[in-house]
Amino acid sequence: MKENKAFTHLHLHTEYSLLDGANKIKILAKRVKELGMKSVSVTDHGNMFGAIDFYTSMKKEGIKPIIGMEAYIHNDDNLSSKETKQRFHLCLFAKNQEGYENLMFLSSMAYLEGFYYFPRINKKLLKEHSKGIIASSACLQGEVNYHLNTNNERNRKYGAKGYDEAKKIACEYQEIFEDDFYLEIMRHGILDQRFIDEQVIKMSLETGLKIIATNDTHYTMPNDAKAQEVAMCVAMGKTLNDKGRLKHSVHEFYIKSPEEMAKLFADIPEALENTQEIADKCVLEIDLKDDKKNPPTPPSFKFTKAYAQNEGLNFEDDASYFAYKAREGLKERLVLVPKEKHDQYKERLEKEIEVITNMKFPGYMLIVWDFIRYAKEMGIPVGPGRGSAAGSLVAFALKITDIDPLKYDLLFERFLNPERISMPDIDTDFCQRRRKEIIEYMIEKYGKYNVAQVITFNKMLAKGVIRDVARVLDMPYKEADDFAKLIPNRLGITLKGYEKNGEFIEGAWELEPKIKELVESNELAKQVWEYSLNLENLNRNAGVHAAALVVDSQKELWHKTPLFASEKTGGIVTQYSMKYLEPVDLIKFDFLGLKTLTVIDDALKIIKTQHKISVDFLSLDMDDPKVYKTIQSGDTVGIFQIESGMFQGLNKRLRPSSFEDIIAIIALGRPGPMESGMVDDFVNRKHGVEPIAYAFKELEPILKPTYGTIVYQEQVMQIVQTIGGFSLGEADLIRRAMGKKDAQIMADNKAKFVEGAKNLGHDGQKAANLWDLIVKFAGYGFNKSHSAAYAMITFQTAYLKTYYKHEFMAAMLTSESNKIESVARYIDEVRALEIEVMPPHINSSMQDFSVAEFKNQKGELEKKIVFGLGAIKGVGGEPIKNIIEERAKGDYKSLEDFISRVDFSKLTKKSLEPLVKSGSLDNLGYTRKTMLANLDLICDAGRAKDKANEMMQGGNSLFGAMEGGTKEQVVLDMIDLGEHDAKTLLECEYETLGIHVSGNPLDEFKEEIKGFKNLVKSIDIEELEIGSQAYLLGKIMEVKKKIGKRSGKPYGIADILDRYGKFELMLFEKQLNALEELDINKPLVFKCKIEEQEEVVRLRLFEILDLESAREVKIPKARYKDPEKQKEEVREIPPMEMLASSSCSLAIVLENDVKKEFLRQIKESALKHQGKRPLYLIIKDKDKQFKIQSDLMVNEKIKDDFKGLEWRDLA
C-alpha cells in the first residue's frame, strides 16, 4: 500500500444546499484546517450560492478553495424540456477563470432556462461550456453509477441498462472533458455502493479514466448526523416519526480525516492521490475587490454617445456628458436662487464634478440620473432624496434629488469622500405601486441578463429554529409555542451567549433561567434544544432583497455572479448575496418602494379631480404657519415619519416653527437622543428655558439651526474642520471612527484636534472639552442629508393634511385598504377631524376611498369621504372592477338589476357575502338577512344569466342577429326574512370593515349606562393630567393574550370601544383572571392611572368593574391639563351611519287618525334632531299598514321626544 501523502474532499455540501447540507462554512473551514488538509471543494446541489463565502472563508484559514457544484443534468437536447423527468448528478470544478465563468453560466442557465423541479443543464450546453472545468461522475445518482447499479429495483424499473451503457456514457464525458473527467467512488457502507465498486475499478482499467475517492459530505462532525436529518425533515415538512420520509441509511456523511479515508480506500490509494491531482489542477484565483487595496470598477453609462447625439451634442465619454448635464441642470435650479449666491453654487458644482470625475463615477451618476429621469417622465412618483446623496449639489442639479444642499448646509463629503475610496450609494424611493416599472425599464434598457435583483438567505434564527425542530420532533404545539416564547424578543438574540471583540454577548440561555429549567427537566425539550443549537443560523431558504438591484452595462451578469430565478417574483436574482457583490465587482442600486409617495400621488389625483388644480411641491411656502400649526398640534396621524405617539408628544413639546425644526425632529425622534438628554436640551433652548451658548464663536453658524445642540453628523464634521483645522474629508473619517468607538484612534485624533485648534489660535483646554462633547453626541448624531430629504416629504404630507384633508385622508385610507385593522384606525382619525366617511355602497363607492360632495338638509354641498369597495375584507379586485365598470352605464336599481348586469364568473359567493354583510347592497330591495340566507340562489341566478347571455350572443341564437342583442331578465323567488337584530348587523360590519357603521355596540346598553358621571371619553385621554386617575366605560372588543418574555407570565392587550372611539389597555395576570369572572359581552368600567412613556400618554389599569359595582363607587372628576377643559362639553364622535340604508331607516308608527298638529310636532322635532337616517311614517289602518317616506333625515335622539310611541329600525 502506497503512503497517503494528501487527500482533498471533492464532494461536499455546505449550508447553501438548503436544508440538505448542514456544513456551516466557517466551522467547516476550521475543521478542515484542524484535520491537516490543504485544500477542499464545495459542490452544493445545483447552485453556487455559497461560492464566495466558501472561497473567502477557506482563504482566511490558509486552505485552498476549489469552487464547484453538483449539477443536475438531463439528456434532452431541449434544455427547458419538461418531457424528460429523469435527471442525474454530475460534479463540476472550476480549474481557472475561464472554468469559473463557464460554471457560473451553466448554473445560471440551469435556473433560468432548465429549471423543472430542479435547476438542470443538458449535455449539449455542457459541451459548449466545458472549457476550464473538471468533472466527476458523482454519487449513486450520477448517470454512470445509475446504469451500473442494476442491483437497485427502482433503477431497473426506470431504465438502468448495466455496465456497457455506463461505460458508453463515461466515454461521452471523457470526450467532453478529455483528461479532466474522473470516476468517483464512495464507501459509506451502503449496499448499492458495494455493488458498483468493482465495476467502477474495472471501467477505470478499460478506459484509462482515473478514479477519485470521495465522501458525500453533508455535515461536519459524526455527531451532527441526527441534526442534519432534522434539517431534512424541516425542508420536507415531515417529522422524524413519518414513515417513508427521505433519510440517509447510514451516518457516514461527515468530514472524514485523510487517515479515515486512507483506511477506507487502502486497496486503491491512487484514488486518494487523484483527489490531490484535481486540487493541483485547480488554480483559480478570484479577483475580489475591496475599498482599500483593490477598489471595484466604477460602472459606465452605456448610452452616453447615443443620448448626446440625440441632443445634437458630440460627447464620446461619460465624464464630459455628465459634466454637461450637471451644469445645464444647475442653470434650471438657479432660477429659484438669489443671484448673489449663483457663484457659490457654481463653485461648489465644479468642485463636486472634479471629485466625481477623478473617482471615475460619472457613469454611476448618469445611470441614476437616467432611471430617475425616466420615472419622472412616466409620472412615477420619486422621493426628494434619501441618505447622504441629498448632500450633493450635482445630484440636485441632475434632479436625482430635490433638496438644495447649500440652503440646508448639507455636505458633499458625507456622500463622497475624496480621501476615502468607497463606492457611491444612492438609494431612491419610488411609489410603491409602480416601483416594478422602474425595474422593468432597467431590464429593457440594459438587457435581460445584465440586471438582477439580489438574493437573501433566511436563516434558522433562535425562535424559528426552536419551532422548526419542535415540530419535527412531534412536540405538542402548545408546548413548542411556550418554549419558543421563552426566547427573549431582542434583535440578534442567539440561543447561547458568545464572545465578540473581547465582550461576552448574552444569549437566551443566560437571559432566561426558565429555559435551563425546562431543558433540564424535560427530555423532549432537551432534544429540541440540542438540535436547535446545532442548526441555529443555518440557511433555511432563499428570498429576494426588498430593494437592491445590480446592473452591469457591459457584460451579462454571469461573468461576475451566477444567476437564480425567483419563484416568488419570477424575476432574475443574483446567486451571491449582498455581502459578496461588491467584492465580485458589482455595484448595487437600491430601488425602495415608499408607501407615502403612493399616498401623495393618490391625494394629488383626487385634488386635481375635485379642484381642477395641480399642486406644485417645489413652489410651496416652506414657512407656511398653518402647516406648522398642524404639526405643533400633535395631529400628525398620516404625516410622514412623525405620526407615532412618541412623535406626536415631541411635536407638542418642541412646537416646530421652521423647516430646520422638522429636519431636527426627524433626527431627534430616536431612542438614543431621547435617552441622552439631547431632546431636552434642544426643546429648552428653543423655548428660552436654557440659554444658548457656544464654546467658540465660530460654532454659531454651525449650531444655530439646532439651538446650540449637536444633532447631526454633518455638524460633527464641520466642528472638526472649523476648530481643529481638518479637511472635510478627514472630518468624515473621524466621524466614522467615532461611530466605531475605537479608543486608540479616538485618542490619536483628539491630540491632533487639540493641536490643530491651537494652531488656529484656540484655547487647547477648551478644544479638548469640545472634543469630549463631540464624542458624547457623535454616537447619537444623525445624517442631516437623509433627515432633510425626508423632512421634505414630512412637510408635503403636512401641507396636504392642512389644506386638503379630505383628499389626503382618503388616499391614506386607500393605502391601508388591504389591512382592515389599519383602515379602522385611520377611520377613527378621520372622524376626529370631523370628516364624515360614507359607508360602502355599490352605487356610490369606487375601488379606492374617494371624495364626493353630498347635499345636506340645507341643500348645501358637503364634502365627504366615500368608503372604497376595495377595503371590504374578502371581496377582491376583479369583481369590484366589474361592478364599477357596469355601474358607469347607470346605478343599480334593484338586486335583480344588479344580478342581470354583473359578471358572475368574477363575482363568486365568497365575494358576494362580504358585500352583503358590509351593507354595500342595501337599498336594492332586500334585507341583509334575506340576501345572506339566499347567497346560493343569487349566485345560481347570476350564473344562469351569464350562460343565457352567452348563448344569445353572435351566431349562437336566433336573437344574436338583432341589433343590440338581448339580456336575460332575472327573477328572484326569495321570501323576505326581515332584518337581523342590531347586534348581528354590527358584528357583520365589524367583520368586513373593521368598524361599526350602522350604530355602536353600546347602543343596546343605553339604559344600563345612564346616570354615570365624570367618566372620561376615549378622545380626551391625552388631555388628562399625568399621574391623575380616570374612569372610562367601554366594551371589550378583543383581548390578545401573550406570554411575557422575561416573566413567562400571561398578559393581554385589550381593545376597548366606547361611544367616542377606541382605547387600549394592558391586562396583567391578575386582571386577566378577574376578567374571567365578568361578563365581557356587557360594558365595563376601567379605573386607570394616566402615565407618560416616551412622550406618549398611556393608561395603566388598576381595576375592572361591572356596571353594578361601578354604581357604588363615587367617581371623582377627572383632572385635565387645561382646567378650562373640565367646563367644556367635549365633542362626541358619532358612529358612521349608513348612506340611505334600508337597515338603518327610522320609522315612527302612527294610527290612521293622527292629527296634522302632531305631524307638525314630528317635523319640528326632526329639524331639531337632524341626522343621516331617513324618517318614515308607518300608518296603521285595521289589519293593514302603509309606509310613507318623508324628506327628513334624523338621528336617534328624536325618539326621546316621543317616548310613548312605537319606533322601528327599518330594513
UniProtKB/Swiss-Prot annotation:
| Record GO terms (molecular function) | 3'-5' exonuclease activity; DNA-directed DNA polymerase activity
Q: Which UniProt keywords apply?
A: Cytoplasm, DNA replication, DNA-directed DNA polymerase, Nucleotidyltransferase, Transferase
Return the broad EC class: transferase
Catalytically driven reaction(s): DNA(n) + a 2'-deoxyribonucleoside 5'-triphosphate = DNA(n+1) + diphosphate
Fetch the SUPFAM superfamilies from UniProt.
AF1531-like, PHP domain-like
Q: GO cellular component terms?
A: cytoplasm
Report the InterPro entries cross-referenced here: DNA_pol3_alpha_NTPase_dom, DNA_pol3_alpha_thumb_dom, DNA_pol3_finger, DnaE2/DnaE/PolC, DNAPol_HHH, PHP_dom, Pol/His_phosphatase_N, Pol/histidinol_Pase-like
The EC code for this enzyme is 2.7.7.7
Question: Per UniProt, what is one Pfam family of this protein?
Answer: DNA_pol3_alpha
* DNA damage among keywords: no
Q: Where on the tree of life does the source sit, at the highest rank?
A: Bacteria
Entry keyword annotation includes Thylakoid: no
Recorded family membership: Belongs to the DNA polymerase type-C family. DnaE subfamily.
Q: Which NCBIfam families match?
A: polc, PRK05673.1
Q: What does this protein do?
A: DNA polymerase III is a complex, multichain enzyme responsible for most of the replicative synthesis in bacteria. This DNA polymerase also exhibits 3' to 5' exonuclease activity. The alpha chain is the DNA polymerase.
In Swiss-Prot or TrEMBL terms, this protein is called DNA polymerase III subunit alpha
Q: Which organism is it from?
A: Helicobacter pylori (strain ATCC 700392 / 26695)
